[in-house]
C-alpha cells in the first residue's frame, strides 16, 4: 500500500527531486569552474530521475576532509560505493580482482549529498554548508 501511494505520486515526486537536483547543480557550477569539484554529467538528449546528487572531489584526502567537516556542520553525506573488485568476496568469486585505476579513483572521490523529496526547506542550507566546507578545505587541506 505504501509503495502504491508513491507510484501514484511518481510524477510529482520526480518533479520535486529534479528541481532539488537542479538547484544543487546550478549552485555548484561556480565551484566546478574553479576546479574544486566536478558535477554530474547528463548527456544531451538524456533525462534522469534525480535519484541522487553527487560531486567528485579532487582526491581521497579532500573527500575525507569534506565529509568530516560537512558532518561537523550538521549535514550528512556518504561515499557512493566500494568497488566490487576490491571487496573480499571478489578474491573468491570474481573473474577479476586487483587494480582498476579509474574505478578506484572515482570511488575515492565521489560524495553523495542529501537528496530526497522532503528536502525543499533545507536545500539552501545544505548548499551554504557545502560552500562553507569547500572554503574551509581551501585553507586546511
Enumerate the predicted regions with their spans.
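PLP-dependent aminotransferase class I/II
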Residues: 1-141
Amino acid at each position: 500500500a505504501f509503495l502504491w501511494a508513491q507510484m501514484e505520486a511518481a510524477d510529482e515526486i520526480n518533479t520535486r527531486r529534479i528541481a532539488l537536483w537542479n538547484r544543487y547543480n546550478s549552485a555548484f557550477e561556480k565551484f566546478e569552474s574553479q576546479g574544486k569539484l566536478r558535477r554530474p554529467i547528463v548527456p544531451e538528449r538524456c533525462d534522469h530521475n534525480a535519484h541522487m546528487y553527487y560531486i567528485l572531489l579532487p582526491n581521497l584526502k579532500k573527500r575525507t576532509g569534506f565529509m568530516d567537516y560537512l558532518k561537523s556542520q550538521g549535514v550528512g553525506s556518504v561515499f557512493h560505493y566500494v568497488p566490487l573488485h576490491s571487496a573480499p568476496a571478489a578474491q573468491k568469486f570474481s573473474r577479476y580482482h586487483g587494480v582498476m585505476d579509474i574505478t578506484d579513483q572515482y570511488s575515492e572521490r565521489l560524495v553523495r549529498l542529501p537528496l530526497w523529496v522532503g528536502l525543499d526547506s533545507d536545500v539552501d542550507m545544505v548548499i551554504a554548508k557545502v560552500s562553507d566546507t569547500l572554503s574551509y578545505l581551501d585553507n586546511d587541506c
